[in-house]
A protein has these predicted regions:
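Feature marking well-ordered beta-strand scaffolds used for ligand recognition
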Residues: 1-159
Length: 159
């Protein structure tokens, strides 16, 4: 954790690790600032497990605590994720856009709510397919970029 209040002088607050680290690529904090979701871009390839989104309790920035992981039903690489209105929008390369509910995050559980597969051939842990997803349009539209597939403009119907 780094305090960047003064951009010219960043200050480390704390540092931690977790079992099975590959390459921490991207994180996002929940709106209440109690939890952090983390994508590790290489763990699926290095350790041969399914897509894992790490969940951290960051209520105490001096002692962030890894409370669990959401493990998906595909081995695709997780790349970029964002949180909006109680959902996680996660670009998982060959598994496409995955939408997860946040309502049980304190129990370290993320529940699948929907998906759109931009690479239907397979879900292998390779670097093609959904690169990112942008869920912040006021209309509810989600833009998903596929590395070779192009741009998908979606309007998810989430129950």
């Amino acid at each position: 954790m780094v305090d960047v209040t003064d951009k010219a002088v960043p200050r480390m607050i704390s540092r931690t690790s977790y079992q099975g680290v590959g390459y921490i690529h991207q994180t996002w904090v929940t709106p209440d600032r109690l939890f952090l979701l983390m994508d590790d871009e290489l763990d699926e390839q290095y350790y041969h497990h399914n897509t894992a989104t790490r969940i951290w309790d960051i209520a105490d920035l001096d002692r962030p605590l890894h409370i669990g992981s959401h493990v998906a039903d595909t081995p695709a690489i997780d790349h970029n994720l964002y949180v909006r209105d109680g959902f996680v929008y996660e670009a998982n390369y060959r598994a496409g856009l995955r939408i997860l509910k946040l309502d049980r995050i304190a129990e370290s559980r993320l529940e699948p709510a929907g998906f759109f597969d931009v690479y239907p051939a397979d879900d292998l842990p390779e670097f093609n397919g959904a690169w990112s997803a942008y869920p912040f349009f006021p209309s509810g539209v989600v833009a998903v970029s596929g590395i070779e597939q192009g741009l998908f403009v979606l309007r998810p119907e989430i129950p």
